[in-house]
A protein has these predicted regions:
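Bacterial N-terminal signal peptides that target proteins for export
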Residues: 2-13
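Bacterial N-terminal signal peptides
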Residues: 11-21
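Extracellular/periplasmic metallocenter environments
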Residues: 23-34, 41, 80-115
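Structural beta-strand segments of beta-rich domains
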Residues: 45, 53-57
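Beta-strand-rich interaction surfaces with strong enrichment in secreted/lumenal proteins
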Residues: 45-47, 75-79
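Short beta-strand/loop motifs in extracellular/secreted proteins, especially
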Residues: 55, 65-67, 110
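Asparagine-centered strand-capping/turn motif at beta-strand->loop junctions
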Residues: 59-61
């Protein structure tokens, strides 16, 4: 009997720990934004996100050439293959305007507005 109670408590503790870990993962995912590159232009060219929340930017490159999503202020740099998709994870940010560009095509520019 004592052994089965111990196993039950171990199971409850394990289930609770896994549930808490799952909640942390869900909270850490934050805001997901999507942007498309077509004809070497970002669409939309301005993204908006809440402050103090992790941000995930999904970039879909519809062009026939690769592109490099880059931002000095966001501290990110990601090469995305032609007709490919990439994901950039950004730390929590204070309110402000954070510019990004395609390093392979300097005319392609956009901004992340954090409020």
């Amino acid at each position: 009997m004592l052994n089965s109670q111990r196993q039950l408590w171990h199971s409850i503790i394990l289930a609770t720990a896994l549930a808490i870990a799952g909640c942390r993962v869900a909270l850490a995912q934050g805001t997901t934004l999507q942007i498309t590159v077509q004809n070497h232009q970002f669409s939309p060219s301005e993204l908006r996100a809440p402050a103090n929340t992790p941000i995930v930017i999904v970039i879909k490159n519809n062009d026939a050439t690769p592109m490099e999503f880059e931002s000095v202020s966001l501290r990110v740099e990601k090469i995305i293959a032609a007709k490919g998709q990439g994901v950039v994870r950004v730390r929590t940010l204070s309110p402000g305007r954070y510019e990004f560009f395609d390093d392979f095509n300097q005319g392609s520019r956009g901004a992340l507005i954090v409020q």
